[in-house]
Amino acid sequence: WLTRRFAYDSFSEISHAASDKDWLDITTEWMKDFISYSEGKYGKKIIAYILSGGGTSEWYEYDSGRSSRIKNTAWRKWCSRNNISLGEDVPSESSLQIASHENVIYDPQTEMHKIQYWRFHNEIIADAVLHFAKEARNLISLDKEIGVFFGYYLVSDNKLVSFGHLDYEHVFASSD
């Protein structure tokens, strides 16, 4: 039912889903209901919860810079929060595929918009992970672990920035 409600699939487009407050709200309520039910019925047998989302339930995607109305809106809000002025829309998918230095490294002098876009992309996914961990922790006792499959930074070079895991230090530092 959830995939029919939105114009994207959170399995393959987690950054788009994570950019959507409605998706976050609905999914959070579903998770909280699931945890409450599980704790009530099986709580004494459960020692950990794994929070999963995105590609293969590991919070990644290979979107290569595709955008959407909802992600453009989130980009503008992110830029505003970070006092960055880089335009109304995210950089085009085709421009993100080109880098000044041997087509591998962006030039901060001329391609800062691309660097900041990928920072936004990775942060929006990490923020979703942390959001769900915090909401889950409120319902789960401290003696139970909460985990995620996240933080793969040794993936193929042409997919690394769009993979969504480059804000792993933020996630790993979480107390939740």
Model-predicted regions and their roles:
Residues L2-S175:
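Polysaccharide-binding and catalytic clefts of secreted carbohydrate-active enzymes
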